[in-house]
Regions:
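An amphipathic, hydrophobic-aromatic interaction surface with interspersed Lys/Arg
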Residues: 1-42, 46-47
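Long, amphipathic alpha-helical surface segments
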Residues: 29-112
Length: 112
């Protein structure tokens, strides 16, 4: 399913592995609609690596505490989904999400 989403795209093994790892974490639906995939299909490999850094948010149906911001609203204009930016320096909420994306990005750029 993953390989079929990149028809005609030749990747180094390191790139393939890290994008597949991303897909394991976020799901094939997120992969299929990602800027990474769009860039790869266009032959833009370095911008695809940069797009890895877009995935730095943790989401919730309620505001969990300070730093959470609404990003989806219901028909009445009330927040219905909240997110936290995991790249916030010193955060103790989801630091691992950001460090994992940074590691993927570094490995991707190294493969270029």
């Amino acid at each position: 399913m993953f390989r079929a989403s990149l028809p005609g795209v030749a990747l180094y093994q390191a790139e393939y592995d890290l994008y597949l790892d991303f897909t394991y974490q976020y799901g094939i639906g997120a992969w299929r609609t990602s800027r990474m995939r769009t860039r790869l299909l266009a032959g833009q490999f370095a911008p695809a690596c940069q797009a890895l850094l877009d995935y730095r948010f943790m989401t919730s149906a309620r505001k969990e505490g300070p730093g959470w911001e609404p990003y989806q609203w219901d028909a009445a204009g009330r927040p219905k989904r909240w997110r936290y930016d995991c790249s916030t320096p010193g955060n103790k909420v989801c630091r691992g999400v950001w460090t994992r994306q940074q590691a993927r990005h570094a490995a991707c750029m190294e493969a270029q």
